[in-house]
A protein has these predicted regions:
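Conserved beta-strand segments that form the floor/walls of ligand-binding pockets within enzyme
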Residues: 29
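Conserved G/P- and acidic residue-centered "switch" motifs that form tight phosphate/ATP-binding loops
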Residues: 33
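ATP/NTP-dependent adenylation/nucleotidyl-transfer catalytic domains that generate, transfer
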Residues: 1-26, 42-45, 50-53, 60-109, ...
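Catalytic nucleophile loop
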Residues: 36
């Protein structure tokens, strides 16, 4: 991997997105994990620290204190403005108002609350929301529709998770963040690889095979292929029926 050229291309892309929208910078959710750290580093490189706002949005009793501390450390390291917004009261207010739902609906409400907060600041500051999704997550739909998937652009969306680990080292992301077990932080004890049912190394190997049109006859391959096909709707704009020929 030519890390310098990859960084340059992504940096140019970020600048182009912001300029095309006549925006004045970006807002991004900083979780204390590797993906958001990498995006923060790239946004600062592209726009300068004064044009990057980080939102740190923990949930009481769920988000690890270490993750909040690491997110703040990254923000201070880069010299960017950050806001810590604890989301528990917002989530509680919504669930009480809306009534009891199933576990999936309640869990997915959290990233949707975070999305609303990001756009609240982005709208107020004339900025875009930078996403932090990687190619592995996007490919299998491992994100919440109109939650963490609700962004204006995805700077690292063409890099697999295993490539992000290498890229982060090149950018200078602290080693302790690179070594962390990846987690969406939606419930206590949650890990990405535990939910996906395989390591990112295994997942990325299969995704690269699918991308090249190579097939494999085993349970993990079939599971990943099912996830890719079943999440296609998450990667597209809402479908529209064609009626112009009837008018």
């Amino acid at each position: 991997m030519d890390f310098e050229r990859i960084a340059e291309r992504i940096v140019d892309f970020i600048r182009e997105q912001v300029e095309a929208a006549n925006a004045e910078g970006v807002v991004l959710g900083l979780s204390g994990g590797i993906d958001s750290a990498v995006v923060a580093f790239l946004c600062v490189r592209a726009l300068g620290r004064e044009k990057v706002l980080a939102t740190i949005m923990p949930e009481k009793g769920v988000t690890a204190e270490e993750d909040v501390a690491d997110a703040i450390e990254i923000a201070k390291m880069l010299g960017i403005e950050y806001r810590v917004i604890e989301i528990s009261d917002i989530v509680k207010m919504l669930t009480e108002k809306l009534g009891k739902a199933n576990k999936s609906a309640e869990i997915n409400l959290k990233p949707r609350v975070r999305m609303m907060i990001n756009y609240y600041y982005a709208n107020g500051l004339n900025r875009l929301v930078a996403g932090t999704g990687n190619k592995s997550e996007i490919s299998i739909g491992y994100f919440t529709k109109y939650g963490d998937g609700g962004v204006d652009f995805q700077p690292i969306g063409d890099l697999y998770k295993t490539e992000i680990f290498q890229f982060a080292k090149f950018l200078g992301v602290p080693e302790k963040i690179i070594r962390k077990k990846p987690t969406a932080g939606l419930f206590v004890g949650q890990t990405d690889e535990g939910e996906i049912g395989m390591s990112y190394a295994e997942l990325d190997e299969i995704l690269k095979m699918i991308e090249k049109g190579i097939k494999r006859d085993d349970e993990k391959f079939r599971r990943v292929l099912k996830l890719v096909n079943g999440s296609e709707h998450k990667r597209r704009l809402p479908p529209i029926p064609k009626v112009r020929d009837l008018i």
